[in-house]
Swiss-Prot record:
Residues 19-20 form a propeptide. Keywords: Disulfide bond, Glycoprotein, Hydrolase, Protease, Serine protease, Signal, Zymogen. PROSITE patterns: TRYPSIN_DOM, TRYPSIN_HIS, TRYPSIN_SER. Gene3D superfamilies: Trypsin-like serine proteases (2.40.10.10). Residues 1-18 form the signal peptide. CDD domains: Tryp_SPc (cd00190). Belongs to the peptidase S1 family. Granzyme subfamily. It is an enzyme of class 3 (hydrolase). Its EC number is 3.4.21.-. This is Mast cell protease 2. One of its GO terms (molecular function) is serine-type endopeptidase activity. Mucosal mast cells. InterPro entries: Peptidase_S1_PA, Peptidase_S1_PA_chymotrypsin, Peptidase_S1A, Trypsin_dom, TRYPSIN_HIS, TRYPSIN_SER.
Length: 244
């Protein structure tokens, strides 16, 4: 139940009050050309948003708990309230949720979106590399995540892309999370600072040395954030990418 609560918090409407924030700075416009902004409708009919990232011209990776209907993807965005000439808005043709996804625990929180057409790659819209199966990031590594989530507990969701640097933590650091599996997930942040993912940041990448190692999955007050560990899922990912 505890895991369910903080997964739900990442998707709460802007007035619902999440406990943690991204706590970073505004990103340089279009400096992260792989970033995707997702808009979708939940089962109860509410309009929500998540982050994601482009891993192939026609595929976006995000969190499985960001699934919904009428998923629209905006690429090349910095300010999502403006009609920027760099933006490419593409609807989703098909969703691929990991068959073992568990909403309550947050395990296998990964989803691929096949776009209706390929993105036009350029300096503002581009793919990000994935790790190898043996690329297991170790504690102490400094990485980055980004998103359009809330900038403070009582602040609205950000309209511009923000980024924050996080430290990869060891297993002990995520002991406050009711469900955590070191093989399936990455623990990043700090238990003593407010730098973390938060409301509206789900699905965004954890980037280390220009490689996407994680997917923003869940967070909890006074604990590091949890990211889905991408290297574990590579066989499934490449199987989906090869599908028609």
């Amino acid at each position: 139940m505890q895991a369910l609560l903080f997964l739900m918090a990442l998707l709460l409407p802007s007035g619902a009050g999440a406990e943690e924030i991204i706590g970073g700075v505004e990103a340089k416009p279009h400096s992260r050309p792989y970033m995707a902004y997702l808009k979708f409708t939940t089962k109860n009919g509410s309009k929500e948003r998540c982050g994601g990232f482009l891993i192939a011209p026609q595929f976006v990776m995000t969190a499985a708990h960001c699934n919904g209907s009428e998923i629209s993807v905006i690429l090349g965005a910095h300010n999502i309230n403006k009609n920027e000439p760099t933006q490419q808005i593409i609807k989703t043709e098909k969703t691929f949720v990991h068959p073992k996804f568990q909403y309550l625990s947050g395990f296998y929180d990964i989803m691929l979106l096949k776009l209706q057409k390929k993105a036009e790659l350029n300096s503002d819209v581009d793919v990000i590399s994935l790790p190898s199966s043996s690329d297991f990031i170790k504690p102490g590594k400094m990485c980055w995540t980004a998103g359009w989530g809330k900038t403070g507990k009582n602040n609205p969701l950000s309209v511009t892309l923000r980024e924050v640097e996080l430290r990869i933590m060891d297993q002990e650091a995520c002991k406050d999370h009711s469900d955590y599996d070191y093989q399936l997930q990455v623990c990043a942040g700090s238990p003593t600072t407010s730098k973390s993912i938060g409301q509206g940041d789900s699905g965004g990448p954890l980037v280390c040395d220009s490689v996407a190692h994680g997917i923003a999955s869940s967070y909890e007050a006074k604990a590091p954030a949890v990211f889905t560990r991408i290297s574990y899922y590579l066989p499934w990912i490449y199987k989906v990418l090869k599908s028609k």
